[in-house]
UniProtKB/Swiss-Prot annotation:
It comes from Measles virus (strain IP-3-Ca). Glycans are attached at residues 32, 64, 70. This is Fusion glycoprotein F0. The chain crosses the membrane at residues 491-521. Belongs to the paramyxoviruses fusion glycoprotein family. Residues 370-447 are annotated as: Interaction with hemagglutinin.
Length: 529
């Protein structure tokens, strides 16, 4: 008696645990979704990039070689020639745009003084320009340094011999100046001047400058096609900055905790605003955004496993990503987003409305979840979730590695859930997996679950189904038209005629029904005799 009671208690506890696991967590009912092969494989916070901050960065292409002038004149002359081939086309394109942008000023009637109203683009003089180029041209004008600032910057760059230096100008923001080969000159060539011959120093510097020029060409080469609207990522800039991207970002004043997310999402961009072919430097406007976390929004990633109904293989059609906020479930467009362990970073709002039927599906109504037949090669026939293996063992070979036996899936089961109590180590599709304690029921019976409507995602099938639906609509239209004709003909009858017809029908019924009854009785009597 005690043994039977113990078994009952253990069974009750086990079922209670399973019921707890099947309850929805938040808005999405993971328990019911797992019955049709849909599981969540990760959740993360949601962050959106907000308005960018701007700062100027100068790439000083010509290093300070005052102490090496006697040994490097030939190499420097060749290096300058190469730089001009890159810089002059960019300079000409920038000048062509900025010369056709002028200030618009208006005169206030009260104080009779001019005030700035904006900028206007001289389209007639410019000729052909795309919308992106026009927008970039206006932004270029607004971020340009004044001619006086350029002169001051040129003078400061000629005297500095630091690889990275912050230059502050009166009344203006700090400008960061970077030279990619200055550290090499300061730390390797100058200390070894007494040990190396002049020719060898020139050769070493020439090779270093040639390599640096190659990096500059790969960085700014695409800008030769469209210098106005071309954007450069900070990762690409790191090559021209000597590879020390962290030091540069620190000098720029960026200390946000989401730096990794912005870097991975390539949110930091640079645009050329000035090219100087006299002192060989490029001025860039660096835009680096801040991140705003949208509170209470969680992004979930979904994965599906195929399941079998008889000889047919199906899978549930759900989005790859969804987002929850309060009771609301939204679709999530991941095209502009980067996914990291710390959260999801998007360059723009990625949420958009979800249909009520799909929301019902995700909340646990499996009959609202559309399904489609597997065609060709399907990605997932097994998946590991919460330490348990969810597998479609009717389509792939499932084997218990511990005992060497085949794990079979009964025809009335749509999926198999394998845990350590069933088989500690499983071999599925050639992959050996060690599973954990049970988190899901052993299997899901087909007759215990309501499946959703079948749909087709193949283009040919969709077209065929659409054609069939149109044909049925045309048939229904013809039937409606014929019924309208009958109704119109009925309208032509007078009310008196309708009354006569009804009386005749009633009299016919009163006479016909008794006659029919008498005939039936007569036949029954004959059979009885």
């Amino acid at each position: 008696m005690s043994i039977m009671g113990l078994k009952v208690n253990v069974s009750a506890i086990f079922m209670a645990v399973l019921l707890t696991l099947q309850t929805p967590t938040g808005q999405i009912h993971w328990g019911n979704l797992s019955k049709i092969g849909v599981v969540g494989i990760g959740s993360a916070s949601y962050k959106v990039m907000t308005r960018s901050s701007h700062q100027s960065l100068v790439i000083k292409l010509m290093p300070n070689i005052t102490l090496l002038n006697n040994c490097t004149r030939v190499e420097i002359a060749e290096y300058r020639r190469l730089l001009r081939t890159v810089l002059e086309p960019i300079r000409d394109a920038l000048n062509a745009m900025t010369q056709n942008i002028r200030l618009v000023q208006s005169v206030a009637s009260s104080r009779r003084h001019k005030r700035f109203a904006g900028v206007v683009l001289a389209g007639a003089a410019l000729g052909v320009a795309t919308a992106a180029q026009i927008t970039a041209g206006i932004a270029l004008h607004q971020s340009m340094l004044s001619s006086q600032a350029i002169d001051n910057l040129r003078a400061s760059l000629e005297t500095t011999n630091q690889a990275i230096e912050a230059i502050r100008q009166a009344g203006q923001e700090m400008i960061l100046a970077v030279q990619g080969v200055q550290d090499y000159i300061n730390n390797e060539l100058i200390p070894s001047m007494n040990q190396l011959s002049c020719d060898l120093i020139g050769q070493k510097l020439g090779l270093k400058l040639l390599r640096y020029y190659t990096e500059i060409l790969s960085l700014f080469g695409p800008s030769l096609r469209d210098p106005i609207s071309a954007e450069i990522s900070i990762q690409a800039l790191s090559y021209a900055l000597g590879g020390d991207i962290n030091k540069v970002l620190e000098k720029l004043g960026y200390s946000g905790g989401d730096l990794l997310g912005i870097l991975e999402s390539r949110g930091i961009k640079a645009r050329i605003t000035h090219v100087d072919t006299e002192s060989y430097f490029i001025v860039l406007s660096i835009a680096y955004p801040t991140l705003s976390e949208i509170k209470e929004v969680i992004v979930h990633r979904l994965e599906g496993v195929s399941y079998n109904i008889g000889s047919q293989e199906w899978y549930t059609t759900v989005p790859k990503y969804v987002a929850t906020q309060g009771y609301l479930i939204s679709n999530f467009d991941e095209s502009s987003c980067t996914f990291m362990p710390e959260g999801t970073v998007c360059s723009q709002n990625a949420l958009y409305p979800m249909s009520p039927l799909l929301q019902e599906c995700l909340r646990g109504s499996t009959k609202s979840c559309a399904r489609t037949l597997v065609s060709g090669s399907f990605g997932n026939r097994f998946i590991l979730s919460q330490g348990n293996l969810i597998a479609n063992c009717a389509s792939i070979l499932c084997k218990c590695y511990t005992t060497g036996t085949i794990i079979r899936q009964d025809p009335d089961k749509i999926l198999t859930y394998i845990a350590a109590d069933h088989c500690p180590v499983v071999e599925v599709n050639g992959v050996t997996i060690q599973v954990g304690s049970r988190r899901y029921p052993d299997a899901v019976d087909l007759h215990r679950i309501d499946l959703g409507p079948p749909i087709s995602l193949e283009r040919l099938d969709v077209g065929t189904n659409l054609g069939s639906a149109i044909a049925k609509l045309e048939d229904a239209k013809e039937l409606l038209e014929s019924s309208d004709q009958i109704l119109r003909s009925m309208k032509g009858l007078s009310s008196t005629s309708i009354v006569y017809i009804l009386i005749a029908v009633c009299l016919g019924g009163l006479i016909g029904i008794p006659a029919l009854i008498c005939c039936c009785r007569g036949r029954c009597n004959k059979k009885g005799e």
